[in-house]
């Protein structure tokens, strides 16, 4: 009998994740000097599994020097779908177990449902324009999943924005822009349709070339595909 439902009983996952040398690839473009396909992450700021998937995707992209394209999607409940309380509690405890295995902080949650999600996505394009979208999304995810920061408040959001190297005064003006609101809602839906159209129904989903996989526990398969590509590329480059 386990005293805690969050105890890690069996752990064989991720043991070799990003532990091997990244190999080399043939030269590519100036934007993608290694000539690799990019890594795409379909992501929801409210999804606990996306929180883990984000950190693993960033780690993977950095280890293999891959471009990472984060594509935010509205949470199911903000699209009119119901999530039973029992399922929510299962996800919380399961995420705690997964986070513990990976050495990630999780559990001091400030649910961003509603305004917290909207404000995140509203500022995402601004972060992209500064080239700091990964840092912004990561800081936001840490804030609402591990630090109990209420992103729907100006005080909470200001902290996240400033941690990400963004200008709070400018960010605040974007929050009340009808044009920005329409824009992010459109690209969030476009991202969802792209994900569905390629055969995945939920987040986090990872895409590398033609390979698209759902679930933060599948990212090891993505790494295998990267390594296979690099092995093949290295053989061609040598020949």
Feature locations, PLM:
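Short glycine-centered, acidic/aromatic-flanked micro-motifs in structured strand/loop junctions
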Residues: 43-45, 110, 208-210
């Amino acid at each position: 009998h386990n005293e805690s439902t969050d105890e890690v009983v069996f752990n064989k996952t991720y043991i070799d994740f990003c532990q091997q040398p990244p190999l080399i690839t043939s030269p590519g473009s100036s934007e993608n000097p290694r000539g690799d396909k990019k890594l795409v992450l379909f992501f929801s700021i409210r999804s606990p599994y996306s929180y883990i998937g984000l950190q693993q995707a960033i780690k993977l992209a950095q280890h293999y020097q891959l471009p990472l394209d984060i594509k935010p999607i509205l949470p199911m409940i903000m699209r009119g779908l119901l999530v039973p309380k029992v399922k929510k509690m299962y996800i919380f405890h399961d995420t705690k177990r997964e986070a513990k295995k990976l050495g990630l902080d999780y559990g001091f949650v400030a649910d961003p449902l509603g305004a917290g999600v909207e404000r995140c996505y509203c500022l995402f394009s601004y972060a992209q324009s500064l080239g700091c979208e990964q840092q912004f999304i990561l800081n936001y995810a840490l804030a609402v999943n591990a630090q109990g920061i209420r992103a729907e408040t100006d005080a909470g959001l200001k902290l996240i924005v400033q941690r990400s190297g963004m200008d709070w005064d400018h960010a605040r003006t974007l929050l009340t822009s009808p044009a920005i609101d329409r824009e992010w809602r459109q690209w969030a839906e476009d991202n969802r349709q792209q994900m569905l159209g390629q055969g995945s129904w939920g987040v986090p989903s990872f895409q590398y070339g033609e390979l698209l996989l759902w679930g933060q526990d599948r990212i090891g398969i993505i790494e295998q595909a990267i390594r296979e590509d690099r092995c093949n590329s290295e053989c061609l480059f040598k020949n």
